[in-house]
């Protein structure tokens, strides 16, 4: 029978339990085994396989997908290993098997056949005295923590531990490989990740013909129609060669009015503008532009300069354009 309010109480109880077990994971997991395994993978020339049964198999698939996205030669071994799929495994390959208990029947049935290749076998388990651990050449021992369900049977906490380990291994390997954004982007050309990883500033800028310009001698009052009509919240202050001298924003206007009152309207822009503003090259990665906008004193617009001399303004990059493209 439904009792009003019980869902909230149970949810809160499980939430606190999640926080507790996550803390226990970080307190008890010996991560030195991860860097040791990473060293092994960095020197390895053959294929790398991961597998597991049930929910552990889902974690193995996710780890393989993550590694493949940055170019690692990693593959998933299906549960049909003994029905022909064993043929993809070659002598010297590394095979990593997930099993929380270390006693998963299907996994143990695979081991003699894998050993006959032979392969380097890595067991990933929460049971250091299990059969999987005993037969493995290298063992990753994950913390043995209580599951979240009332029976302590459903893979919840255990798969979270496996996932945390998987991400730690994958990201350590990625950093050691010195994978660049362009490397990653070449493997992920589609979707929102592809847009962010492969996009360049020149793909999203407003061209110079649409940029509001003023000379340094233009007064604040004279610049207001330009400032308001373009809707960017700024004007770029340039010389006759379109070299960027500074930027004047609606924020500069508000601060000037607060400090100097109406007298500011007679000031030339060169006296009130922001000199040496944040700028970005047209050939820069669009992700870099997001970092620049959000770092230090956050801004919503970046003047875009030429890639060669980085002095001549070629356009304007506004956060609204990035938002419309789905990059925020």
Swiss-Prot record:
Ordered alphabetically, the record's keywords are: ATP-binding, CBS domain, Nucleotide-binding, Repeat
Alphabetized PROSITE patterns for the sequence? CBS (PS51371), SIS (PS51464)
The UniProt similarity line reads: Belongs to the SIS family. GutQ/KpsF subfamily.
Q: Which InterPro entries match?
A: CBS_dom, CBS_dom_sf, KdsD/KpsF-type, SIS_dom, SIS_dom_sf, SIS_Kpsf
Name of the molecule in the record? Uncharacterized protein CT_399
Which residues belong to the signal peptide in this entry? Answer: none
- Which Pfam families has this protein been placed in? CBS, SIS
| Organism, scientific name | Chlamydia trachomatis serovar D (strain ATCC VR-885 / DSM 19411 / UW-3/Cx)
| One function term, GO molecular function aspect | ATP binding
Task: Please list the residue ranges annotated as the CBS domain.
Answer: 207-264, 273-328
**Organism domain of life:** Bacteria
> Boundaries of each SIS domain copy?
37-179
> Which positions are annotated as binding ATP?
52-57
Q: Which residues form a coiled coil?
A: none
Q: Note the CDD domains from the entry.
A: CBS_pair_SIS_assoc (cd04604), SIS_Kpsf (cd05014)
Q: Which GO terms describe its biological process?
A: carbohydrate derivative metabolic process; carbohydrate metabolic process
